Amino acid sequence: MAQKGVIYILTNPSFPQYVKIGYADNVESRLKQLNNSECIPFAFRIYATYEVEERLTDLKLHALIDQLNPNLRSIDEVDGKKRVREFYAMSKEQAYSILETIAILGGRKNRLKLWELSEEQRKDVELAAEIEDEHHERIIIPFITWIKSYP
């Protein structure tokens, strides 16, 4: 196989309810590119990759997911322009299951790789969860209590 690249599943503790599904010739380079942004509190992590022979094979996967449930994809409008993103409201396990099914059906499960988090990445995931819990306890719960007590 003359490998062209991979379809990847990326996660980010900053928004754990989404995964990013895309294509890259070199997933480590793509990861560095995404993580150069100062706009996201935590870095992206590679959850899984699937080796493909054709570039932009992820577009076919995006189309499949959109057909199954068009509400999963992150789509918004900024300055009158529609932005269709590679982010999907699903768990990393659900995204992996889709890739795994495709790999099995194609007889290419050996091209599928589940990546391990480093200890530092695990700590970041835990920290992000703690921050989310603290935000919920400090802001959301008191706000809901206040709303309920309002005459």
Question: What is each PLM-predicted segment?
Answer:
Residues 1-151:
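Non-catalytic accessory segments flanking enzymatic or RNA/DNA-binding domains
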